[in-house]
């Protein structure tokens, strides 16, 4: 796992990160895109300029730092012409845990072999919030979840890979939220405003313990604030009105979603008030409950490539570098004031 710690203006962060990426050029960085996709990426660039403007300065710094084409980085980071991970995320408020601290949990579902490419990034852009976020492969702008110094934690799960047109992708929206917002309501407001690309389920919790589930789609976005102090998102929409927007969902994905929902609901009802990080780890390690899976293909094994647990009131992350059934969760310090 790579640990990246950078601060400064967005451009300076990009420049320093770009210099770190020079050695990756012999490994195929940046990936090649067709002229058509490079041209199409400009529409996504315009949307990010509108809603997350500083991040483009970071990309420009990266392009200069590693001497690669800026538009190739735009196509790689801002568009849907890329990897398609699914995920599982759940959150529990403080009153239902034994320690009295809220917990936020994520399984990143992609190729298990990609676990070696996990990167955690502690960044502090000038005038913004410091954050601790997770990405992989080549660590550029993207964050697939994380937590910031205000105690706001966010992640998400893709509900539909249908490309509905230029907008702000999950990985970019998550980064911008970590950089800028302190409360769940602020993050929700931002997600409501942005044009969506894929269908995404976001889950958010802040330091006050406010959980929001945001089922987001270009045609409609539905926000739920669970009264029970627990919620989860996974590989499809939960609400019937949002499911109508994904009419071609496979029976296998629907069944997995329902299995996960039923298991987590029963587990929460049984354990609430006594939940600990270890009790979460215990269920994450079990294959039969379908919180993770192993699907062997010619390309590799699809499943969980890493898992992590954070708390809005803690400066520690527990991370499993690989499928949790085969790997231990180890503690890592979250240091927002790094030198």
Regions found by a protein language model. Give the residues of each.
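Short, surface-exposed beta-strand-loop junctions and turns on beta-sheet-rich folds
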Residues: 110-112, 160-162, 218-221, 323-327
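Fold-independent oxyanion-binding glycine-rich loops
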Residues: 106-108, 137, 157-158, 207, ...
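Asparagine-centered polar/low-complexity signal
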Residues: 107, 148, 201, 232-240
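Short, well-ordered beta-strand elements within core beta-sheets of diverse protein domains
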Residues: 175-179
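Structured soluble/peripheral alpha/beta segments that form catalytic or ligand/cofactor-binding pockets
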Residues: 138-144, 150, 161, 184-193, ...
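A contiguous strand-loop segment
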Residues: 13, 28, 32-33, 50-171, ...
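Short acidic-glycine loop/turn motifs at beta-strand connectors
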Residues: 93-100, 148-150, 205-209, 216-219, ...
């Amino acid at each position: 796992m790579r640990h990246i710690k950078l601060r400064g203006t967005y451009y300076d962060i990009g420049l320093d990160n770009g210099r770190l990426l020079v050695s990756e050029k012999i490994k195929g960085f940046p990936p090649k895109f067709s002229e058509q996709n490079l041209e199409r990426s400009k529409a996504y660039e315009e949307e990010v300029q509108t809603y997350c403007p500083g991040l483009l300065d970071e990309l420009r710094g990266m392009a200069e730092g590693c001497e690669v084409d800026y538009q190739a980085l735009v196509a790689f980071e801002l568009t849907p012409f890329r990897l398609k991970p699914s995920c599982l995320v759940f959150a529990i408020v403080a009153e239902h845990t034994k320690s009295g601290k809220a917990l936020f949990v994520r399984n990143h579902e992609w190729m298990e072999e990609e676990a070696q490419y996990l990167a955690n990034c502690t960044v502090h852009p000038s005038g913004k919030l410091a954050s601790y976020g997770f990405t992989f492969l080549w660590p550029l702008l993207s964050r697939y979840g994380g937590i910031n110094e205000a105690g706001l934690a966010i992640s998400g799960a893709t509900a539909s890979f249908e490309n509905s047109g230029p907008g702000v992708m999950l990985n970019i929206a998550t980064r911008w939220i970590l950089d800028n917002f302190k409360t769940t309501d602020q993050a929700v407001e931002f997600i409501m405003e942005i044009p969506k690309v894929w269908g995404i389920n976001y889950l958010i919790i802040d330091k006050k313990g406010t959980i929001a589930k945001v089922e987001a789609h270009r045609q409609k976005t539905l926000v739920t604030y669970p009264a029970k102090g627990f919620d989860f998102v996974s590989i499809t929409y939960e609400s019937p009105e949002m499911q109508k927007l994904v009419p071609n969902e496979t029976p296998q994905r629907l069944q997995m979603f329902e299995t996960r929902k039923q298991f987590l609901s029963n587990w929460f009802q049984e354990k609430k008030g006594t939940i600990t990080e270890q009790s979460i780890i215990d269920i994450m390690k079990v294959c039969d409950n379908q919180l993770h899976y192993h699907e062997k293909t010619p390309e590799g094994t699809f499943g969980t490539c890493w898992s992590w647990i954070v708390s809005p009131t803690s400066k520690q992350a527990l991370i499993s570098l690989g499928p949790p059934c085969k790997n231990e969760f180890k503690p890592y310090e979250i240091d927002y004031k790094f030198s």
